Amino acid sequence: MIPPAFEYLRPNTIPEAIAFLQQYGDDAKILSGGQSLIPMMKFRLARPGYLIDINRISGLSYIKEEAEYLKIGGLTREAELENSLLIHSKYPIIFDTARVIADPQVRNMATLAGNLAHGDPANDHPATMLALGAQVVAVGPQGERVLPIESFFVTLFTTVLQHDEIVREVAFLRRHHEAEGLT
C-alpha cells in the first residue's frame, strides 16, 4: 500500500523542528525511525499532512552514563542498544529488549524514543522503561520537560507529549555494578 500524500520536511536543528510542529500542529508527525508510523500511514490509520524527519539533527544519538543517570539520545537506534558494550554489561534488560525487536533491518532504523513516543501498547520498550523507572526528556517551545514514565502513557497511541514537543532523550538511574538486576 502507498500512504496518503504528505509534505516531507527535514529540519537541521531542534528549534527548527519545533517551529515546524508549531506551524503545522496536529497535522504534523515526527519521523525518526518510522517503523511504526509508516505502516500506520500505509493502512490509513495515520494521515499526517506533514512528516518532520529529525534524522538530520545532530547530537541526538548517544548512550552515555552521566552523573547518576544512563542517558539514551532520541535518535539512538535499537541496533545501537543491542551492540553497546555498556548496555550489554550493565543494563541487560535493555539489551534483552532491544535484541528481540523485529529483525535486524527494523532495529537498524527504529529508535527507543520513537518506540515510546508512538504509545503503542504492543511495543516492547514501555514495560522495560517502566521497570527501570525511566524519565522521558521532551523539548518544546516552553523549554525542557522531564516526564516520569509512569505518567507518560495516557491511552492507546497517546502520550503526554504536546504536539510541539520532541523526545530529546530517555534517562534513568545508573546501575553501578555489572549484572545488577531488578527485583
Predicted regions, residues:
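C-terminal structural segment of proteins
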Residues: M1-T183
